[in-house]
């Protein structure tokens, strides 16, 4: 039988790419093949390969939308499933170097172009929201399509993605594009932009959107107001946020709990905790119940102000109202009570937390352990550490470091070293605070060589040596009369390590130099400190004045004290410290001269100075003189004769007493 073959006919393919260099190509199992000499049409009967001839003029690419048009099938377009094109485009957005060329090839192959609505929808998708670089590349690629222009929603969607990544530079560029094209503002776009700009505190862009809303007759919603205020507060424009709040109070849209929380947060950030507290009470009088966020914001602000009493009061309010107290709030309240030395109250809050079903974390245990350790109750701190471990919590390096610090301050260095080795065994990274506590403890125990080895070990382990570590070792050197080593370490501190020499560093070294009678070197060190602009503390001047007074240079100490006054440094207790030092050294006459100097400057001598002098006289066997000074009419450097107040010098009284 004769076998007939039907001649294939040419059909334009609407969803296949055009072969530019060939008049025809091979199509096999859904794929296109190149036409070359190795491909023979005779093999088509056995391999299901057929010739397909393309038309010389393909139809134009079709714009695709994120949802299929089913308006003729359903009445409502809500809850529509995305078009299959969406998932295919998302699969191509892989961030690779060939991503854009893959997108080009795909669109050519299927004769499609992505509409602005499609681009906006893809940018909003969960797959892209946390990939700002891919979103940016896709946005830039899509605008290269022929006859394509981004709409406002595309820009808004991109800003939202970039805001999550806090990419302010790109957001500013996109914002300038929006302004340039003068899109008419919509409610949804305005709200989204205000939210994004507000998160980043971009006030200029925020106010531009606000003006565009007014120009387009868009009425702000409560949502809009809240995000506007949040943006102003984030940028520390608290006064502006306050004015917006006042507009809301007098307008149609009233503040809600979010508005109040934002305003309270603004006051707290600006350090106006009292105004924040007033706003909290005002909120309650207007029928708005404070929530967990309100109280948490206030507790954090009060803790930062060291107003621990208010922290406790706010916590008690939360407890009474049945508001869930977050772990961080418990940590702050317990920490505040511990800092005030109210360890029993802190422990009560801790137990109350557990009783109410809240599980403590490592941070809360650490706060309480630190409180016990700093108060000298090291045994209680260790017991709490063991309880923490028994309950399944693993102490971190901070927990161990506060225990070690407490042990070292109580002279229990061996136990501290045991915990140090435990941390190493557990693979915990020892921090500089941990090392400085051990170095200080070893130094005070006279184990200076071990302290020095530990100091050098820090560098080997890659642990940064801060001023606390240097100060601990310098203090160890000076206390054991190794002043030269202390001076060498002091120089190395700045020259090699670039570590700041603090006023405490100078205080330690000054004290050590004076103890070794290296007075001139100490004075040069003092001058160096002043030249560097480091303000001396009372302790620092005490180290200097004590050294000078004991070496008979009281006038020099007084002169230096006078030089500090123009610098704005007023050390009220400085003269008292010097008098105390002289009295302890038995130099009563010099102490009296110094007391007279106080009255000559127009200041009254505190009664406690007379007490110091009386005690000094009694200790050197001048009990009769001490009694006369105690019962004399001189109170604080003055003698009263009826209504007349006459200045009396201490030296005169002293000479009179000696003469009698």
Swiss-Prot record:
InterPro entries: Mito_RNA-Proc/Resp, Pentatricopeptide_rpt, TPR-like_helical_dom_sf. Residues 1-12 form a transit peptide. Keywords: Mitochondrion, Repeat, Transit peptide. It is found in: Mitochondrion. GO terms for cellular component: mitochondrion. It holds the Pfam family PPR_2. Its main location: mitochondrion. PROSITE patterns: PPR. PPR repeats lie at residues 151-185, 186-220, 221-255, 256-290, 291-325, 326-360, 361-395, 396-430, 431-465, 466-496, 502-536, 537-571, 574-605, 606-640. Transmembrane segments: none annotated. Belongs to the PPR family. P subfamily. PANTHER family: OS07G0590600 PROTEIN, PENTATRICOPEPTIDE REPEAT-CONTAINING PROTEIN 1, MITOCHONDRIAL. This is Pentatricopeptide repeat-containing protein At1g03560, mitochondrial. It comes from Arabidopsis thaliana.
